Amino acid sequence: MSNVAGELKNSEGKKKGRGNRYHNKNRGKSKNETVDPKKNENKVNNATNATHNNSKGRRNNKKRNREYYNYKRKARLGKSTENEGFKLVIRLLPPNLTADEFFAILRDNNNDDGDKQDIQGKLKYSDWCFFEGHYSSKVFKNSTYSRCNFLFDNLSDLEKCANFIKTCKFIDNKDNITIPDMKLSPYVKKFTQTSKKDAALVGTIEEDEIFKTFMNSMKQLNENDEYSFQDFSVLKSLEKEFSKSIELENKIAERTERVLTELVGTGDKVKNKNKKKKNKNAKKKFKEEEASAKIPKKKRNRGKKKRENREKSTISKTKNSNVVIIEEAGKEVLKQRKKKMLLQEKLKISNSSQPQSSSAQTQPSFQPKENLFVPRVKILHRDDTKK
């Protein structure tokens, strides 16, 4: 049976090997022959020693590589070992205590005979920073205490300042007295000095072309009111932008005129006049060229073809309009004829129903009269001709 892991086992529960070829090393030998166990032991020992030595060599190489990498990295990223100083943090000062009140209390507690105003000379701090606190307006919220930080160049000066501040009592405007808590900060942040060298781009803005165009455009905006009401970029020359806008407006106007003439057809007469003028000028030029040149040049018949096509299109349009007019006139004539026919039928019906009178019999039928009059024609003869 196969195990869950997919390994085959014997009936005894031992794992099966890959086959007889791997684990039966005495195959092909007689049973009487014996194998020296020392030879096999020596082989095994040599193999283990070799693997152990190889693993040691790899570990040593890794260590060397790490040390070399760390050495290079430290050399590249190494910082200057300057004395950053020491910072004394004074905490748990009264909440409403201000910086002026804090230094006033320090001056009052100065018992030296010297000037009380020169407290920095006594404490010997290089820099200071004060953070003012406040009382909380909510009942269940703690008030924030004020604090002060001093920077010193030496630890001895820091210790003297700390011993002096321990003797002081700080009071705020609400008569709350607190004893401050002082600690040495492990992290000191100092602002690095700015480089005295000027940057490469300092003083080159006046030579920049974009800056020049900007200044010129600002002057033009102040001088001309036309530019102020248009959306032009200030970083480009306003004169060019204005000329471009005028060209665009002219092109748009021409295109709108073309579209309107195509839709409405009002500009046909103007076009025909212009074309006639062009044709006349072309004919004059052609005649002058013929007179100047000895060899006559053939003229292309492009204009004639275009004219013929246009005439055909105009004729078809006029024909269509005439057909419509004729149809309407024919309809009106047919209506009049129908009315006459109806009137004649009504007269016939009325005459058949009534007895015919003598006057009606004597009257001839309604017929159109023929032209009985002979036209008068005069024959004229010339005097020269013989009669």
UniProtKB/Swiss-Prot annotation:
BP-aspect Gene Ontology terms: cytoplasmic RNA surveillance; DNA recombination; nuclear-transcribed mRNA catabolic process, 3'-5' exonucleolytic nonsense-mediated decay; nuclear-transcribed mRNA catabolic process, nonsense-mediated decay; positive regulation of translation; protein ubiquitination
Compartment list: Nucleus
GO MF annotation: an example: mRNA binding
Biased composition (Basic and acidic residues): 30-42
InterPro entries documented for this protein: Nucleotide-bd_a/b_plait_sf, RBD_domain_sf, Upf3, UPF3_dom
Record's function text: Involved in nonsense-mediated decay of mRNAs containing premature stop codons.
Composition bias type Low complexity, residue spans: 350-368
Primary gene name: UPF3
GO CC annotation: cytoplasm; nucleolus; nucleus
Key word Glycoprotein present: no
Biased composition (Polar residues): 43-52
Note: Present with 1250 molecules/cell in log phase SD medium.
PANTHER family: FI21285P1 (PTHR13112:SF0), UPF3 REGULATOR OF NONSENSE TRANSCRIPTS-LIKE PROTEIN (PTHR13112)
Region (Disordered): 1-71, 270-317, 345-387
Keywords: Nonsense-mediated mRNA decay, Nucleus
Entry-linked Gene3D superfamilies: 3.30.70.330
Pfam families: Smg4_UPF3 (PF03467)
Motif (Nuclear localization signal): 15-31, 58-75, 284-300
Protein name as it appears in the record: Nonsense-mediated mRNA decay protein 3
Entry similarity comment: Belongs to the RENT3 family.
CDD domains, alphabetized: RRM_like_Smg4_UPF3
SUPFAM superfamilies: RNA-binding domain, RBD
Sequence ranges of Basic residues compositional bias: 15-29, 55-71, 272-285, 295-307
Keyword Nucleus: yes
